[in-house]
Each structure stands twice: as C-alpha cells, then as structure tokens.
Amino acid sequence: MSKLCRKYSPLLSLVLTTFVLFGCELEEVTVVEVDEVVIAEIYLDVSTDPAGNIARAFLHRTVGVGGVDTLPSLTESTVTMTRTDGYSFVLTGEATDECLESSPLEEPGACFVSELPVASIGPGDIVEVLVELPSGGRITGASRVPGSFKINSIPSLCVLAPNTLMTVTWSSSSEAWAYLNETSIRGLPEALRGSGIDVTDDPLYLLGLSISDSDTTVIFPSEFGIFNRFTSGYADLARRLQAGLPLGVTAEVSVTAVDRNYVNWARGGNFNPSGQVRVPSLSGDGTGVFGTTVGRSFDVLVSNDSSGLPACPLS
C-alpha cells in the first residue's frame, strides 16, 4: 500500500470564500465554539514477504478556538499495537512525510511507523491499537487482518505481448470487504511518443476497485484507472489502454484485500451534499480509522520476446 495522502484544493477554497463574500448578505453571524478533536488514521499492511509488512499512524486534529499554540504536541503521543496472544510493539515517531505527501493543516500532525516488529503479524490475526495522547486521553480500536489469498496462475514476473489484455483472478480473502487493484506503469511517455496521446506521469499510477469480497476478477490494464477517468487529459489514454499496453513498458500490478474498517472510512456512506461522511472504527478521546490490508503483487514486461521469462496467462 502507498503512503497516506491528503490533498487540498485551492480552487475549492476560493469558491467557498467567494460564495461567502459575494453570494449572500448575512445580517447576523453566530460563532460556534468548536472543540478540539484528535483524528487518528492508522493502517497495518501485510505483504507476501513479511519483511515488507508496515504499520503507519498519522495523528492530527480539528483545532478549537484556542488554536494549536494552546495544545500539547501530538508527537508526544504513544501508539501501541497488540495481537490477541499478547505480542505487542510500539510505533516509532517519524517525519510526517513518512505518512503523507503534503498537509494543508495548521498543525502538520504526527507520524508513527513500525516495520521490523510488524513482520510477526500475519493474515487473520486480530490486532488491537491503543493511542495514548499527551493530554492523558486514550483512543482504541481493533481489526482482524484479512485472510491470506493468492493471485491465480501468474508468476512474480511475466511477459505480456503488446496490445493484449490479461485476466487477473485471485482466491477470496476471508474478512475482506473489498479489493484495491493498483498498477504503476513505467515507460508510457516514450512508448506513446508520436501517437498523439500525451502522458506526463512516469510512472503512471492507476487504481481499480473490486467492491465486494467475492469480486475476484479484473482485466489488466483496461479495468484499471476508474478513478482517473475524469482527470483532465486522461480520456485518450483510457481509450488506448482498452486495447492493452504498448511495446516496451513495464508495470507492477497489485491486488490488496482491505478490511471493513478501511472500506467504511474510505467510502463513508451514501451521497451527502455537505461532503463525505466517514464511518470511524476508533473510539475514546478521539476518532478515526484502524484499517488492515493484505497485498499480493506481480510484475509485467510488455515485449514480443519472452527472453526465457514465463508468458503472462491471458485467461
């Protein structure tokens, strides 16, 4: 799984500001004092190789009328994960860019990471998390890591002919509520040079989604990128990918089983005109999510020459 990412839209801020200043005239303004709320976004990712397991926790908060200067730093918090058999480890404080790419928040928050101790956590384990805040408050939650699964009949590296689609299937993961299908494609700008299709990102990251625990089939690459299709300039590339990948590119493909907590926090619920409403899985003196995932991946080389490598199965 990739780092947690928060994106802030200056355009949205401008629209809201313009609406307030010019869209209406208010005769009376009531200021409501907003309490400080700590938000914890905690994820534990289990990979094929236990050495690749990682846990991340990002703590931030809504700021009340007192402002951040009146509050103890969240970097003084302690984040502990405990398996039901008593095995326990504490996450280590790290720079915030280990948890997210950028932050629009007045207070950037606090990031905690653990890698080596997480190697002992496996699919199906029940893990509890405890966040101890510098104020003395506690935030708690628990998750059962999705069960083990495998990608069917695809080796860790395979060769795919140009302009060819391949069917990716996998076994079901118990406790999974959905699957994230991701790919990172390298070499597209050069491979499509002169085709009239402009690609600026290299690698190009595309995301697909299987929305239930039994939805275990996806077509590569045509069914990846469902969240990119409304991105400016992506339409031509999306049509091109319906026929497969061009000669010379490489791709990393992954399927990640995600738990109930992850799905509820990501999807929120039904459409809300006022914005996304997230469903938390943490409680106590704060709110947030404790999500667990299990990932599987393989690499694809697009070529007419196998060079002794196994061919990617097409179905």
Regions found by a protein language model. Name each.
Residues 2-12:
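Bacterial N-terminal signal peptides that target proteins for export
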Residues 24-315:
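A sequence/structural signal for flexible, mid-protein segments enriched
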